[in-house]
Each structure stands twice: as C-alpha cells, then as structure tokens.
C-alpha cells in the first residue's frame, strides 16, 4: 500500500507475504524458487541460483538498456548473510537523495522521480545485533536519508529469546537515543503490533511520508 513504483526494497527471506501482496512475485514463482527451477520463465528472481524467498527485479532489459525503474516496484537481489541488506539499503536511499540534489542527474527521469523514492529495508530482530545494522542506523540518522527500516520482532532469533541478545529485550528501547528531536538529527522510531492493520497503516502513512520529504 505504501510501497510505490520507483521505490526500492532491500530485504531478507521473510518478506514472502509482502512480495506476494505487491505482485512482485507469484505463488508459482515461489515454488519454482523452492525447487531451484533454472527456467527464467518460471523464476526470473534468481533462475534457480539462489535460495527460496530471495527476490530481485530487473534493472535492465534484454538489450542492456536501463529499465524504467520509476514505473516498477524495485527490489535489490536478496542476500543470505544476516544484516547484509543494511549497507545496500543505505546506498539505495542515498542514491535517491542524490538524484534530488544533483542537477546533472535530472535528465535520468526513468531512474528517479526527482529523488522522491524511499528505500524499504526489512530485518529480523536477532540480526539487529550485527554491526552492519548499527553502522547503517547511525549513518542514516546523520545523513538524513530516505530510508525506512522495518524490524520484524517475533521475540526469538535462531531459537534464542531476545532478552539474551538485545539490550532491554527490545530493539526499539535500545534505539531510543536515536529518536529525532527538534533541532537535532536522528530517526523517527515507531512501535506497532503486526496484527493491528489499521494501526500499521496509520504509522506507515506518517513514517513513509516523512521519509519521502527527507
């Protein structure tokens, strides 16, 4: 609903519902990935070269020309290493802002709509213990990039309760020092229950709107 044409996703292997709901993938492609089908007609995401639930969209056509990225939902090729998606997400967000700020890039209207794109980054709560996560959060807060980070918190990480690996057993509590305040840089931090659809829509509406204005 808030993932618009031109936006980017840098996520991980628990985004099946999102990719299906956005029609970035289909149930048939999901099972083609599961069985490692090497037929590009059945699975263009990785053509049998990656694990299942690893997604990617095409940046170029068969002739090597740039695709109209502003007309499609974009996802960078997923990586299996935990938190590996974080640095790339920052780069994609920074690219959007660069298109907005650099006059010489305005001619590439098929790549960016004047930098109005947001990079959506997903990560599990256990992977927030990785160094990549903290480096990117700090850099995004300092640089004020259009990056929206979604932390899927199910209470466990590889069967270990989050109290054993996350300060205060809550990543949102641990991140409180990054909360933006008037006259400072930082991040807007939200906490919402995944089963509360109306609540999520309200939070996403505000958060993504602010990210697009960054």
Where are these regions (language model features)?
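Structural signature of the thiamine diphosphate
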Residues: 197-214
